[in-house]
């Protein structure tokens, strides 16, 4: 059909894993031949500082416009205290399968059982849960792994255990 309109959407710089043998840029160039390339560089989730850092890493301009975005480093005690003051439906907590994520959740359930319990928390350590039939409720705090978090969003995101050594394990 000569009048068909094809739209290819994606950003190869945002991929986590590179397990394809396909050279995507080459394929798109051959498949589409004559096309318009649009760059989406405005990010509504990140601050300008984080967006600039990410843009440097990805070698492309990214404009962060979220002035409310804050990054803070905390120890477990500080995180427990911070989370105890939040509404469960605002929270997405991401971590490795065994580490500070589960320790923090255990403490929250023990010290703040009215706020953090089986009715208010969706917890999973499986890397494929976001593809399954079990879904977190809109009013639940979410405690899960990085790989299982695709498509999950909350007002507050807490990252656990994302160290250089953890990154090295993931990329190998």
Label every PLM stretch briefly.
Residues 124:
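Short, flexible loop segments at boundaries between secondary-structure elements
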């Amino acid at each position: 059909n000569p009048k068909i309109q094809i739209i290819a959407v994606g950003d190869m710089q945002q991929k986590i894993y590179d397990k394809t043998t396909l050279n995507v840029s080459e394929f798109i160039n051959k498949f589409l031949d004559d096309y318009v390339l649009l760059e989406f560089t405005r990010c509504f989730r990140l601050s300008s500082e984080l967006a600039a850092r990410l843009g440097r890493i990805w070698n492309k301009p990214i404009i962060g416009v979220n002035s409310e975005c804050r990054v803070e480093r905390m120890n477990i005690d500080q995180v427990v205290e911070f989370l105890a003051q939040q509404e469960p439906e605002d929270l997405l907590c991401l971590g490795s399968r065994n580490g500070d994520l589960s320790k923090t959740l255990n403490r929250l359930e023990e010290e703040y059982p009215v706020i953090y319990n089986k009715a208010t928390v969706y917890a999973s350590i499986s890397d494929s849960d976001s593809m399954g039939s079990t879904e977190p409720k809109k009013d639940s705090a979410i405690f899960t792994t990085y790989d299982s978090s695709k498509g999950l969003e909350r007002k507050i995101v807490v990252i656990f255990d994302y160290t250089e050594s953890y990154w090295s394990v993931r990329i190998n």
